[in-house]
């Protein structure tokens, strides 16, 4: 049986960026062997990077300087269901995924935006859907 491939989103353009890095390290380090995690880091500036390196480098933020990082996006095309890696020479590859596990904290991570993107792409998400995330995050509604 093929391993399930889970995209783990971490970091983010929020004040809780550092907390998300520690959560990502814990989650990725504890992934069962039957899961193939894909680490997708989001910088403080909001840049999405495919990160194939050591999980140890996530904790201190040095993952962003890894020369093997490359830009990536979640494909909004429901027929692709994957992460598109954008290689420096303009080429791209799609890595199919079975689900998304956002370990983002705060704005842009727990407020329904990422959850809505996953819904648009037809990807299952681990955690709240976009409506529940938006309602629970915005305490002024």
Question: Positions of the model-derived regions?
Answer:
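ATP-binding N-terminal substructure of ATP-dependent carboxylate-amine bond-forming enzymes
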Residues: 1-141
């Amino acid at each position: 049986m093929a391993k399930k491939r889970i995209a783990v989103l971490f970091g983010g353009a929020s004040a809780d960026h550092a907390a998300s890095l520690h959560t990502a390290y814990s989650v990725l380090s504890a992934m069962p062997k039957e899961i193939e995690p894909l680490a997708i880091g989001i910088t403080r500036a909001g840049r999405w990077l495919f990160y194939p390196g050591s999980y140890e480098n996530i904790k201190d933020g040095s993952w962003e300087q890894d020369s093997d990082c490359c830009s990536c996006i979640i494909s909004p095309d429901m027929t692709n269901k994957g992460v598109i890696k954008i290689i420096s020479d303009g080429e791209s590859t799609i890595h199919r995924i079975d689900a998304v596990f956002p370990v983002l904290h705060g704005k842009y991570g727990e407020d329904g935006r990422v959850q809505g993107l996953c819904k648009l792409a037809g990807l299952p998400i681990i955690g709240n859907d976009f409506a529940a995330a938006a309602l629970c995050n915005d305490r002024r509604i």
